[in-house]
From Swiss-Prot:
It holds the Pfam family Ribosomal_L17. InterPro entries: Ribosomal_bL17, Ribosomal_bL17_sf. One of its GO terms (molecular function) is structural constituent of ribosome. It comes from the Bacteria. Keywords: Ribonucleoprotein, Ribosomal protein. GO terms for biological process: translation. The lineage of its organism: Bacteria, Bacillati, Cyanobacteriota, Cyanophyceae, Synechococcales. One of its GO terms (cellular component) is cytosolic large ribosomal subunit. This is Large ribosomal subunit protein bL17. Belongs to the bacterial ribosomal protein bL17 family. It comes from Synechococcus sp. (strain CC9311). HAMAP family: Ribosomal_bL17. Disulfide bonds: none annotated. Part of the 50S ribosomal subunit. Contacts protein L32.
């Protein structure tokens, strides 16, 4: 039984949710930090940490998995070059989520997710 084994749905169909997380992950790897809602930041954390762990592994299969997920090809190659030196001694916990002020329009809880 799959009781309480849920992914964050984010109020979207599966295809839109996957595209949203792919876009946020690409942006986080490119910029180093992203301001988004708290729920999206928590969902993004899992995906971003998975991509960095694959980049630390450095195998061809890992590179192909990340190339299939991240939108920018040059960004993937840069990630695979920098991740082993930047996160080599760290086992997980590559991101930090910091809460910020609520969004003005709908009072949604906002957060900044950044790479450590």
């Amino acid at each position: 039984m799959r009781h309480q084994c849920r992914v964050p749905l984010l109020g979207r169909p599966a295809d839109q949710r996957k595209a949203l997380l792919r876009g946020l992950t690409t942006q986080l790897i490119r910029e180093g930090r992203v301001t988004t809602t708290k729920a999206r930041a928590k969902a993004l954390r899992d995906e971003a940490e998975r991509m960095i762990t694959l980049a630390k592994n450095g195998s061809l299969a890992s590179r192909r998995r990340v190339l299939g997920y991240v939108y920018d090809k040059q960004l993937v190659h840069a990630l695979f070059d920098k991740a082993p030196t930047r996160y080599g001694d760290r086992n997980g916990g590559y991101t930090r989520i910091t809460r910020t002020v609520p969004r003005r329009g709908d009072n949604a809880e906002m957060a900044i997710i950044e790479l450590v």
